[in-house]
Swiss-Prot record:
Natural source organism: Rattus norvegicus (Rat)
Keyword Secreted: yes
Listed name of the protein: Bone morphogenetic protein 10
Chain's role: Required for maintaining the proliferative activity of embryonic cardiomyocytes by preventing premature activation of the negative cell cycle regulator CDKN1C/p57KIP and maintaining the required expression levels of cardiogenic factors such as MEF2C and NKX2-5. Acts as a ligand for ACVRL1/ALK1, BMPR1A/ALK3 and BMPR1B/ALK6, leading to activation of SMAD1, SMAD5 and SMAD8 transcription factors. Inhibits endothelial cell migration and growth. May reduce cell migration and cell matrix adhesion in breast cancer cell lines.
Gene that encodes the chain: Bmp10
Subunit structure: Homodimer; disulfide-linked. Interacts with FBN1 (via N-terminal domain) and FBN2. Interacts with ENG.
Residue stretches spanning the membrane: none
Note: Does not appear to contribute to radiation susceptibility in the LEC strain.
Propeptide position ranges: 22-313
Residues modified by glycosylation: N67, N131
A Pfam family that the UniProt record links to this protein: TGFb_propeptide
Record localization: Secreted
Keyword Glycoprotein found: yes
Family: Belongs to the TGF-beta family.
PANTHER family: BONE MORPHOGENETIC PROTEIN 10, TGF-BETA FAMILY
Amino acid sequence: MGSLVLPLSAVFCLVARLASGSPIMGLEQSPLEEDMPFFDDIFTEQDGIDFNTLLQSMKDEFLKTLNLSDIPPQDTGRVDPPEYMLELYNKFATDRTSMPSANIIRSFKNEDLFSQPVSFNGIRKYPLLFNVSIPHHEEVVMAELRLYTLVQRDRLMYDGVDRKIIIFEVLESADGSEDERSMLVLVSTEIYGTNSEWETFDITDATRRWQKSGPSTHQLEIHIESRQNQAEDTGRGQLEIDMSAQNKHDPLLVVFSDDQSGDKEQKEELNELISHEQDLDLGTDGFFGGPDEEALLQMRSNMIDDSTARIRRNAKGNYCKKTPLYIDFKEIGWDSWIIAPPGYEAYECRGVCNYPLAEHLTPTKHAIIQALVHLKNSQKASKACCVPTKLDPISILYLDKGVVTYKFKYEGMAVSECGCR
């Protein structure tokens, strides 16, 4: 059986209709013409198509755009996304004039939940562990380590706390011996803390190196040391990193990347054949062997006044057009891994494509010819189909193997324009 590929908008259109308790009007209640092809008609007309196989194919197509092999397993408890990721999503969802520095943003949490910070010779050491996995076909634009610093000071005596922060990558020896491990400096900087707040450190180069080595665990060690000698620093205050387990201030590695594998969808131009629709001599005997009497009457009726016919047909309200279709992720059982939005307006294309095809429906040459053949012999070819011709992206925040991921442009999710194909 040949592969059957449908756009994502069609996937959600079908899923929404199949979902239990769906408020969407059933096909039998449709005010459209009875001969308008919907999914049920399409399936029965194509021999050898198994419905369950089709659903699996559509699900695979949806997940492929997210670089997922399958729907992430549902955990017993819902994962609380980092506040930073929620802020990113809300920022770009509400402000359409702004856009992130990359299309894909992943957040990796600290995996070392048991090690405690230690102090030695005036240096406070914090161990961190990140399990980083970034597909090779993506380009890492930027990576930053976000640490929440806790400042404790006497506000009456001191303005702030002056500290030096060094971020090391712990490199294990070939035999795994801790005695032979080395420390690579990733960041060395000075900060002057006056209030508890987030501090951001650029570790882009290290993250690009990690990407090349494939999915693996990487150990970091944060050193905080005073810029004063120990005697002068006594009583001035403290600056620490918030390492509390299950805390909204968990250390966070945020990676910004772009997908380099997909080609941008090209806009289909209006075919010049539209301008020649009225010039076709439909009454010649050379056209498909000559029309029968019923088809001839229909063609003559269409050609009497093309403009008036278009207006009259459009006034009926059943011509091809975009109509509302709201997708609720909870209703289709995907709210366990799609964090935001809870749903969105996907729209759908409904209506009929009668000859002559209106210019605003941007028909292809194939659609125009198919409409002509249907007009001549409805048993030989069906009408052209009312389908999405332009799709818009949406932004989505979701879980990918436990990693909270934000995708700014998740292409092909909402219908922008409809046409005849």
